[in-house]
Amino acid sequence: MAAEANEDQIRELVAKMQAYQGRMEALQQQANLIQASINDVDSALKAITSLEGAGEGHELLVPIGAGSFVHATIAKPDKVLVGLGADISVERTVADARKIFQARRTELEKALAETNGVLNKVAGELMRLQQEAEKYRQ
């Protein structure tokens, strides 16, 4: 009877550990996506900064992917098209675009910190379960 109870406890423990492991993997993927978004915003901020001194008619190379570029000429150096999501963009001044990107970065950093906090809690609980599982090995 005690052996059956032990087996049930072990099965339950293993199921919990697998659930926590799955949750950790999902949280890590979420953290990676948030970090990629932060990197994207940083690239946009860097691009805005590098274009500030450029005037109308300034020529530059624009990346199109796969390490390829096209030649382009700046038509409106004081305006930036800012993506809002769902394939919707709005035209903003460079200063307004910078504020939008900085606000996005702040929100993304907050989301990343929250995600990492939950990830740490889940990792702690998983570690506790692993220590509990070690008791059954002895």
Curated annotation (Swiss-Prot):
Pfam families listed in its UniProt record: Prefoldin
Subunit structure: Heterohexamer of two alpha and four beta subunits.
Species annotation: Methanocella arvoryzae (strain DSM 22066 / NBRC 105507 / MRE50)
NCBIfam families the UniProt entry points to: prefoldin subunit alpha (TIGR00293)
Keywords assigned by UniProt, alphabetized: Chaperone, Cytoplasm
Chain segments annotated as coiled-coil in the UniProt record: none
Subcellular location, record wording: Cytoplasm
GO cellular component assignments: cytoplasm; prefoldin complex
Annotated function: Molecular chaperone capable of stabilizing a range of proteins. Seems to fulfill an ATP-independent, HSP70-like function in archaeal de novo protein folding.
Official protein name in the record: Prefoldin subunit alpha
GO molecular function terms listed in the Swiss-Prot or TrEMBL record: unfolded protein binding
UniProt family annotation: Belongs to the prefoldin subunit alpha family.
InterPro entries, per the entry: PFD_alpha_archaea (IPR011599), Prefoldin (IPR009053), Prefoldin_subunit_alpha (IPR004127)
